[in-house]
Amino acid sequence: IKTKLSHEDAFSKYLIGQGAKINKPYGWQIKILSPESFLRKIGPVLEKRLTESKFRGLTRMLKMNFWKYELGLWFEDGKLVKVEQTSDAGRILGMNPYATIQLFLGFRSREDLEYAYPDFYVRDGLGELIDVLFPRKPGYIHYCY
């Protein structure tokens, strides 16, 4: 019997406790076509994570360099007020476009990605902030094939 459930839900944990086998999830084949739109959409989640951290009330702009373009995330008093492309050259957050999807979706941590991808980097002591905004979390993508 295949359950097609996350390994983190209560029922799956029960089945595992009864001796069920865990299959590795199939590789993620996800592409975020517009990181700008995606980050706007998850803005309330990012704001909640800030509120529950030492970064409550954050006011600053984060520049994410995606090789061909940069995105600026403007936070004011802990609220994400603007996400848009910027032309300013910045090399503080180097976002490998392929690896960043794993960060945004919680599949890999910032440290995992910095280790695996030399062109994924977080400088100027922003690692902890990125960890708060994009923590590693269990997830499951249901696929229908």
Predicted region positions:
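Intrinsically disordered, low-complexity, positively biased terminal segments
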Residues: 1-145
